[in-house]
């Protein structure tokens, strides 16, 4: 059995998957915030419960935000303070007496989608998350590409390209990002960015779901806003696709629930690609909230 943990600031979620990659059991517990020992205990107790329930010693994979293993072997995850700065992989491997694998939660999202029954035909899969932030991951032949600093797929921290500034206006604000830079595309293409763009042009502080509801009702202002957003997304994504050239792009995050993102994006891409390039297949993520657990569990399918 394959055990996959999706660990965040508020919850530790475990999913148990069989050899057919089907979810057999799941359980969630709160994430301890202050005690590293309590954090380790929470993970180990879930593993022990799964071992007992299924009568086996399952493999363990963990998806967690941040950098799973820095040069000194410690975790960097500001959202999980109890474990940040600690040698999490080594400690869990020792306590559980098995090989524990860690990866970034965005890579686990992409890995989950790449192992979808329909998507396994594609050698190079790109996951793109349009949610609270913008991120993603790259999967090649069923294995995540992490890079030495685990920042492969941090698409949100690419800067706005020149074509975007031409489209939006040369006086378009280059907003300061949480990473310390200015003009990162996350500030414009995330769910928060989607709402910020609307307020910037129409001076109305609406949230993304409210804007989408107006769009669905045929509101002309909301429709013009969505057209502008999709054009901006196409410009930025065109740069990424020129570098990566994936077979498939799977879009997740809150904005992926808005059908226009996946149905209207492909037609906008050719003008931003090389003439010989082919637009990849673009799909909405298939596995929703279970994606993080799935991808973490499937870290052991990559041997």
UniProtKB/Swiss-Prot annotation:
A GO biological process held by the record: peptidoglycan turnover
Coiled-coil ranges from the UniProt annotation: none
UniProt keyword Cytoplasm present: no
Alphabetical list of InterPro entries matching this protein: ATPase_NBD, N-acetyl-D-glucosamine_kinase, ROK, ROK_cs
Residue positions binding ATP: 4-11, 133-140
Disulphide-bonded residues: none
Keywords of the record: ATP-binding, Carbohydrate metabolism, Kinase, Metal-binding, Nucleotide-binding, Transferase, Zinc
Enzyme class, first EC level, given as a word: transferase
UniProt EC number: 2.7.1.59
Functional pathway: Cell wall biogenesis; peptidoglycan recycling
Molecular function terms from GO: ATP binding; N-acetylglucosamine kinase activity; zinc ion binding
Catalytic reactions of this protein: N-acetyl-D-glucosamine + ATP = N-acetyl-D-glucosamine 6-phosphate + ADP + H(+)
Binding annotation for Zn(2+): 157, 177, 179, 184
Similarity-based family: Belongs to the ROK (NagC/XylR) family. NagK subfamily.
Function summary: Catalyzes the phosphorylation of N-acetyl-D-glucosamine (GlcNAc) derived from cell-wall degradation, yielding GlcNAc-6-P.
The name this protein goes by in its record: N-acetyl-D-glucosamine kinase
Organism: Escherichia coli O7:K1 (strain IAI39 / ExPEC)
Taxon lineage: Bacteria, Pseudomonadati, Pseudomonadota, Gammaproteobacteria, Enterobacterales
């Amino acid at each position: 059995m394959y055990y996959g943990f999706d660990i965040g600031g508020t919850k530790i979620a475990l999913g148990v998957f069989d050899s057919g990659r089907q979810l057999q059991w799941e359980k969630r517990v709160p994430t301890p915030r202050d005690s590293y020992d309590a954090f380790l205990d929470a993970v180990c107790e879930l593993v022990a419960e799964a071992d007992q329930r299924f009568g086996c010693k399952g493999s363990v994979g963990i998806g967690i935000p941040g950098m799973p293993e820095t040069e000194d072997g410690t975790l960097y995850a500001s959202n999980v303070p109890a474990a940040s700065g600690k040698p999490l992989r080594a400690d869990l491997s020792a306590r559980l007496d098995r090989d524990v694998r860690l990866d970034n939660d965005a890579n686990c999202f992409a890995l989950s989608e790449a192992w979808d029954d329909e998507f396994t035909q594609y050698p190079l899969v790109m996951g793109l998350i349009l949610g609270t932030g913008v991120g993603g991951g790259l999967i090649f032949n069923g294995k995540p590409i992490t890079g030495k600093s685990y920042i492969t797929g941090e698409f949100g921290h690419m800067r706005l390209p020149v074509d975007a500034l031409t489209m939006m206006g040369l006086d378009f604000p280059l907003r300061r990002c949480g990473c310390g830079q200015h003009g990162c595309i996350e500030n414009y293409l995330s769910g928060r960015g989607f709402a910020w763009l609307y307020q910037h042009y129409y001076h109305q502080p609406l949230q993304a779901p409210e804007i989408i509801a107006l769009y669905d009702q045929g509101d002309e202002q909301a429709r013009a806003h969505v057209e502008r957003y999709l054009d901006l997304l196409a410009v930025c994504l065109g740069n990424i696709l020129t570098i990566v050239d994936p077979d498939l792009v799977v879009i997740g995050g809150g904005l992926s629930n808005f059908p226009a993102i996946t149905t209207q994006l492909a037609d906008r891409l050719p003008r931003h690609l090389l003439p010989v390039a082919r637009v990849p297949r673009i799909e909405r993520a298939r596995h929703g909230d279970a994606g993080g657990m799935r991808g973490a569990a499937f870290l052991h399918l990559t041997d």
